């Protein structure tokens, strides 16, 4: 499965992408709010992650068309077809922040989720301190729904974080 936007291709990662993934996520500014990403992050970690990701059809590398390289990841987890809901997760390499890439990737994933998968609800959580992630979610239409205390532990730092819960209904957006 590939999702194509103006500047991006969202596609499953392959073992050839391991070095690009390491280059972008082996950075505490990126990994400090991620529950499952260690720091430092090695090629071995990337290969393990890629092999797991290949079993999940809804986990995508964010590929910059201009270079053909993976610069981040985005995907769905805890997908429940009965209640038509999934959780969104993402990260983006630091040098790509502030360029609208996260917005473009997230909008593409939303469109895929609501149109192709026929989901009714997407949800996301972000560390209270991660204002950029909260702002991204709000920018694309997610609504802040609550606070979960000590709901996430970042693997890279071992630190517990309170998280905000966000939700988005299909009826909230025009696709």
PLM region spans:
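Acyl-donor (CoA/ACP) binding surface of acyl/acetyltransferases
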Residues: 1-28, 63-175
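Proline-rich intrinsically disordered, low-complexity coils
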Residues: 12-13, 38-40, 57, 67
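Conserved GNAT-fold acetyl-CoA-binding loop/helix
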Residues: 29-51
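A generic membrane alpha-helix/interface feature
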Residues: 45-47, 53, 136, 159
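A short helix-loop-beta-strand connector motif used in the catalytic cores of GNAT acetyltransferases and
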Residues: 50-61
């Amino acid at each position: 499965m590939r999702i194509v936007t103006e500047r991006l291709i969202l596609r499953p990662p392959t073992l050839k992408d391991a070095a690009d993934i390491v280059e972008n996520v082996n950075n505490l500014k990126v990994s400090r709010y991620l529950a499952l990403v260690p720091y430092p992050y090695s090629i071995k970690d990337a290969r393990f992650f890629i092999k797991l990701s290949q079993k999940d059809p809804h986990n995508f590398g964010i590929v910059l068309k201009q270079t053909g390289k993976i610069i981040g990841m985005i995907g769905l987890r805890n997908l429940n077809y009965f209640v038509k809901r999934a959780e969104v997760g993402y990260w983006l390499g630091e040098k790509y922040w502030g360029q609208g890439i996260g917005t473009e990737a997230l909008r593409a994933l939303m469109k895929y989720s609501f149109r192709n998968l026929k989901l009714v609800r997407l949800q996301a959580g972000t560390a209270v301190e991660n204002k950029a992630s909260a702002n991204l979610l709000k920018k694309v239409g997610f609504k802040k729904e609550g606070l979960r205390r000590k709901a996430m532990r970042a693997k890279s730092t071992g630190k517990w974080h309170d998280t905000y819960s966000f939700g988005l209904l299909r009826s909230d957006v025009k696709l």
